[in-house]
Structures are given as C-alpha cells and as structure tokens.
Amino acid sequence: MSGKCDNCDCADSTQCVKKGNSYDLVIVETENRSMDTVFVDAPAAEHDGKCKCGTGCSCVSCTCGH
C-alpha cells in the first residue's frame, strides 16, 4: 500500500510531513477578561529543495509544490 505526500510517493501516508503553517488557537479566560493566543509553527523543513516525507521516505525528485 502506498500513500502520497503532495507529489512525493511514500510507503505510508502517515509519514508525510505536513507542509505550510499550522495554527493552534488557545483561549485563556480570567476573571473579567479573556486573551486569545495563536501559536504559529514553522513550515515543514525542505532539504536542498527536496521533500522529506518522514524518516522512512526521502523524496529526491519532487518539487514540493514549486
């Protein structure tokens, strides 16, 4: 069974690295006020312009959406 990581073929799609930014929204409520905090994770790493689809799959010929 094979998965697909954008245009990279991976043995298991769960090994695909999520590309782009991901946002986590945390709402903290205190007595009379609330504070909204958004954490932004860095984009998934690219190695010399090549996709890395996890530890078991290194894609050397894909373009990573470029």
UniProtKB/Swiss-Prot annotation:
The keyword Metal-binding applies. InterPro entries: MT3. GO terms for biological process: cellular detoxification; intracellular copper ion homeostasis. GO terms for molecular function: copper ion binding; zinc ion binding. Keywords: Metal-binding, Metal-thiolate cluster. The keyword Translocase does not apply. Metallothioneins have a high content of cysteine residues that bind various heavy metals. Belongs to the metallothionein superfamily. Type 15 family. This is Metallothionein-like protein type 3.
